[in-house]
Amino acid sequence: MRAALFWTAIAVASTATGVAAAADNLKGTYGLVGAQVCLVAPAGFKQDSNGNLTIPIGETNHSQLTTEGLVIYHGDGTGEARQTFVTIVPPPNPHGAAVSAGTISYSFTYTPEGDNAYRMALKPGSFQGMLNAGPNAGQQFSIEGESRLFRVSDDRKKITVAIDKPYVQKITFSGSSQPVPRICTSISNQSLVDESVTVGKGR
């Protein structure tokens, strides 16, 4: 029951990714704020008439999240992020309403996709999450499957990020080998904090 509640409560926003007009020279630290909503379907999703996995199977629940953090671009098409988040699971919910909070960190790559637009992908095995408040405080988790589109201003000082198409993420919690499928919507904004890649390293 507690694990099921946690699946609902955690909607980690790996929303902290973006790129610049020249992917090979985007370098610096950006501050991030964002929001995310996830639909969790423990039994998975089936295809719609166009072949997209968008139709939930069986019972579902949803969660709402806000996040803040730092994103560091290394200047070589790779980056890393560290974020905090607060998640609310509103009623009605089969496992009850809940509030949770925690931290995440991950590494990513990004590739060009149109004018000033780029596609982000998580580096496999790099995502680490920890719940430090809520019904399942102390639970660790990881996420597989992440794709976001971001657009960068010409001066590289601002980045907008969004999930632009539905896809299934899989979130796995410590103590369980069974990943939980979900589909999320997400938006975030980033602003240049410093051209250094060491800002916030002590967070």
Spans of features found by a protein language model:
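Bacterial N-terminal signal peptides
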Residues: 7-16
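Mature soluble binding/inhibitory domains
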Residues: 21-203
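Bacterial N-terminal signal peptides that target proteins for export
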Residues: 1-7
